[in-house]
Amino acid sequence: MYKPKNQKRSVLKFKRFSNHGYSLFAVLGKEVLIGVLSVATLQNATAKGISVKTEKAETDSTFANRGVLMQEVNVTGTRAPLTVSQQARMVTVLSREDIQAAPVQSVNDLLKYAVGVDVRQKGPIGALTDVSIRGGNSEQITILLNGINICDAQTGHNSFDFPVDISEIERIEVLEGPAARVYGTSSLLGAINIVTRTPQKTSLSAHVEGGSYGYLSAGVRGNIASKDHWNNQLSASYTRSDGYLRNKAGSLNADYHTAKAFYQGNYTDENMAVRWHAGMSLKDFGSNTFYSAKYDDQFEHTFKTFTAIQAENLRGRFHIRPSIYWNRNMDRFELFRGAANKYPFNYHRTDIYGVNLNAYFDWNLGRTAFAAELRNEDLVSGNLGEPLSRPKHIHGTDRDYTVGLNRTNIQFVLEHNIILDRFTLSAGLTAVKNSQADMPMHVYPGVDASYRIGDAWKLYASYNSSLRMPSFTELFYSVGGHKADKHLRPEELSAFEAGVKYDNKGVTAKASLYWNNHKNLIDWISDGTLDTNGAVLWKSVNFGKIKHFGTEASLDFDLYQLLPSQKFFKKFGVAYSYIHQKKVDNQGYVSKYALEYLKNKFVSNLQLNLWRNLDLGFYYRFQHRMGNYIDTNNQLQRYKSYGVVDSRMSWKASTWTAYIEANNLFGAHYVDYGNVPQPGAWVVAGVSLNL
């Protein structure tokens, strides 16, 4: 039976650890079974993240390339963490080394290699990207920055506008499946947590890179770590591109400019830890035909700010972790770029305030956890919402915000964990009430279990449920060929999952099955009807009930461990996912999201060490998407399957790294989203410095 443990800072020692700069992220990442993803370890996840933090030993590049097997590595936590052998639900973790090895310029590009993630890109370098999990859409997942929810209640399209450059990310964690008792509303199909770097020594780093289509990116980061428990870090970056498309008039309509700045600090002593951050993201980009195929000169400007503070006690039997945050999102959409006289610009401002309190304690029957969260979402807009009693001025214009909406979400969680020698069980309930929803407080249960067979095999199974409130866009957007329904009901999901994992001596294999049952699923649909301006009319609706059956499998080889006598082959991996959607009588409707899912996805990668510190990696992905889209001639088109090859070559020295990357190496023609063709071959070269 689970026994109470002293709440001192504890250290777990893994006896065997391969010091490689890459791990299993589906094919690119590392599959980590995280201790039943309990409230005690996950609710209001901190910058330590979903996974157990690994303190990486310092090694030079020679040792790294030889794949030295270190005999003991400390894994330190601020609570008594569950060991690897006790863990149950799957979380995919991409480390900093994995990020550096991949041929990508944005987090969105990186997630394309996660087999369970669907990345539908509408522009270069993540200008506008919809990221979803297991056949869902961008509205159905929660995005977190250092454990703080940064989802945009206006629309999921802008959820990846966070204030840190990809070079400043320590790791990315992907949780697949409903997570109501972990992250609350919006985590209908999972969550993605982005954890930033916190170097323990004073340091300075910078990078610059350039490439195809006028691409340029540069950034700098400075960190001051004092000996009296304080750590402060400041970073900034700028990225631009001319884009790869032109409108009918020959002007740029996929260009991109973004600036980011981020400050984070922390204080830690023997009794407590406090962390805080503040950041901003400014982005201007040509929106091409992103929102309507009829108009090819759309433009969007977004400005976001993020502030948060978190704390936790490090001693005592009763463990408490509170946090408070405020995110502001400002958005200006131009149906005709720079021509407000043709159609007035759409202005929106969303302020999101949140307070979380998570607590747990250990006793003779296990670990009991409870949590509470209050989240307020306030929108003022020019065209989204109900009429305001007192209009608010739009800064820098002669117009006012005349409509808006305010809603509050309250969540309570109760959970208990039982840990035996080979068996782990976690069960809990989440109670949710939203001021906008015309329904009483709803309760969503969840249970996770795992059974360990020896040291290498593990069986696991889970049942979880969750819900999602409609976004403000789904409720009120009626512009440019769209007609929203303000009476949309929340969508709900219940899901079963079962799987097996094998991990031993350089070989990792995983297979899983899942069943997702959607109720009142929200989507935009069209029957081909045109609006008064001749654009295809899309309506937001509760689509009804849809069932998904899916399977995922991956096989990864650490070739340094399997073939220690050679140095050329570093790693090889393959992964595959399959989704079957129960046939729905769509009565001739075309769906924007619900029926446009990835039925088949295959990813693989091979990493080589050519000579000394010269590495070369190849990455391949194949995607087969279901569904149709209406082209610019109002004709119905089916999505075509495609395969893309990417590559990266790098030379890593002690204080600098030089690299060249090629995306879509063979120039495949494809679309992730109807009427928005993706770029052909894209080449980037750069250098980074670390002092």
Which residues make up each language-model segment?
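Short acidic/polar hinge/loop motifs at secondary-structure boundaries
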Residues: 149-176
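N-terminal periplasmic "start-of-domain" segments of outer-membrane beta-barrel proteins
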Residues: 69-100, 130
